[in-house]
């Protein structure tokens, strides 16, 4: 994120050479605090804002922050909000899921009718699938990936299914990291009755494949690709926002407004493409975000 922000600054200064930037890149966790305490003008986040961050801002300022979407999460670039999704063993015939089914598979619900526990409940037939339990693979419940899935697919619930095998990064003695997403797909490779949450960057060398995903029960279904992420068709698309402090009925600070308009311009979005990590947003989406700054 730091390199992208620096390139945005340099690009903006070509049009506004007198502008001066001061920034502290301590990470997403500190950005909102700097905004609502008046230490910063713009909080550019590396992930979607958390509800507790909105609440903290509201407690201090008595109104919510204004969000401007700047970029789209990556397909498979580590640490750049890559697209999450469900995976199965390559020997499993299941091809697709809806978000509602994903919720019913991974989340626990009080009503038994809202829990999907076996493969026949997902439409698989035959003695090798009927009545066979779905084995779940995912991150620890406190992981930021789990937290985001709770918001995006589980209606904010924190109640994961009991028995899910949970993973965290493993730090090896040589300094390398065995990513949790890789561990999930490695273990799923040996379990034809398993379903896991991960990312396509970890597919190579495993006996697994991703499922198509739909927002609605009857589709349309999508894989996570650059096109489907930029177009917001893939249901678990990640969004990279900037948050600003704009009091109700008041204009955006002129300097903040001009900088954000630059980020949403063709030149600003092209910097995202050149950076090669995050993805840009659609021109139509950029136009909608610019409207928020009026």
Cite the ranges covered by each PLM segment.
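Flexible loop/hinge segments at secondary-structure junctions
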Residues: 1-294
């Amino acid at each position: 994120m730091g390199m992208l922000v620096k390139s945005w600054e340099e690009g903006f200064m070509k049009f506004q050479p007198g502008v001066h930037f001061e920034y502290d890149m301590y990470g997403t966790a500190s950005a909102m605090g700097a905004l609502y305490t008046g230490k910063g003008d713009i909080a550019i986040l590396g992930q979607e804002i958390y509800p507790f961050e909105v609440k903290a801002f509201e407690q201090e300022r008595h109104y919510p922050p204004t969000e401007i979407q700047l970029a789209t999460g990556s397909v498979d670039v580590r640490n750049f909000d890559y697209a999450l999704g469900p995976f199965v063993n390559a020997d499993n015939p299941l091809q697709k899921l809806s978000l509602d089914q994903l919720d019913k598979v991974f989340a626990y619900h009080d009503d038994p009718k809202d829990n999907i526990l076996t493969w026949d409940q997902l439409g698989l037939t035959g003695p090798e699938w009927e009545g066979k339990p779905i084995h779940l693979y995912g991150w620890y419940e406190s992981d930021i990936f789990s937290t985001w899935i709770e918001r995006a697919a589980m209606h904010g619930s924190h109640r994961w299914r009991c028995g899910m095998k949970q993973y965290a990064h493993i730090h090896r003695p040589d300094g390398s990291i065995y990513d949790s997403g890789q561990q999930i797909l490695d273990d799923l490779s040996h379990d034809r009755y398993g379903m896991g949450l991960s990312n396509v960057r970890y597919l190579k060398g495993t006996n697994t494949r991703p499922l198509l995903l739909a927002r609605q029960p009857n589709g349309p279904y999508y894989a996570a690709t650059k096109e489907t992420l930029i177009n917001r068709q893939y249901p678990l698309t990640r969004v990279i926002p900037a948050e600003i402090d704009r009091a109700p009925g008041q204009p955006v600070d002129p300097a903040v407004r001009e900088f954000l308009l630059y980020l949403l311009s063709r030149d600003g979005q092209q910097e995202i493409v050149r950076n090669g990590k995050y993805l840009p947003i659609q021109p139509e989406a950029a136009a909608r975000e610019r409207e928020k700054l009026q």
